[in-house]
């Protein structure tokens, strides 16, 4: 039941549960499968690296809903690495860090995400 509910939340066809993991999956289906694993395994810490990369707007919304469900139900910690702040808009963000060339050059709270949305990354890349 839990698997079925999570697959429904992620807009995944139930037949995917019978398939080999990621075999014949599109890029978006693989991303959803990653979030499905997150919801099923409930790790204390998850690192999501470019989870929104290559996803269309609808898929980003769906994946965000899955991540939000993890935040609400599992109470685990997330490290989300992204170049696009879109996926962060509907999530609870405790801290934000900007990394350039391997160094963290700015730390902030959720308001830093809003600042980046308004002015972009250009000011950080010039350092």
What are these model-predicted stretches?
Residues 1-42:
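ABC-family P-loop ATPase nucleotide-binding domains
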Residues 46-48:
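Hydrophobic residue in the Walker B motif beta-strand
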Residues 50-51, 58:
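Walker B catalytic motif
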Residues 57-64:
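Short alpha-helix of the ABC ATPase nucleotide-binding domain corresponding to the H-loop/switch region
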Residues 66-80, 88-90:
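Conserved catalytic loops of ABC-family nucleotide-binding domains
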Residues 83-87, 101:
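The feature captures the ABC ATPase H-loop/switch
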Residues 89-98:
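Conserved catalytic segment of ABC-fold P-loop ATPases
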Residues 99, 103-126:
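Conserved beta-strand-loop-alpha-helix hinge in the C-terminal portion
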């Amino acid at each position: 039941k839990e698997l079925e509910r999570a697959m429904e939340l992620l807009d995944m066809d139930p037949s995917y549960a019978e398939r080999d993991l990621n075999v014949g999956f599109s890029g978006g289906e693989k991303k959803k499968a990653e979030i499905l694993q997150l919801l099923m395994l409930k790790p204390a810490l998850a690192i999501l690296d470019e989870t929104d990369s290559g996803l269309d707007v609808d898929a980003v919304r769906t994946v965000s809903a899955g991540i939000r469900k993890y935040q609400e139900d599992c109470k685990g910690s997330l490290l989300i690495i992204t170049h696009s702040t879109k996926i962060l808009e509907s999530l609870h963000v405790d801290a934000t860090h900007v990394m350039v060339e391997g160094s963290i050059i700015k730390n902030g709270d959720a308001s830093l995400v809003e600042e980046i949305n308004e002015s972009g990354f250009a000011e950080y890349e010039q350092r």
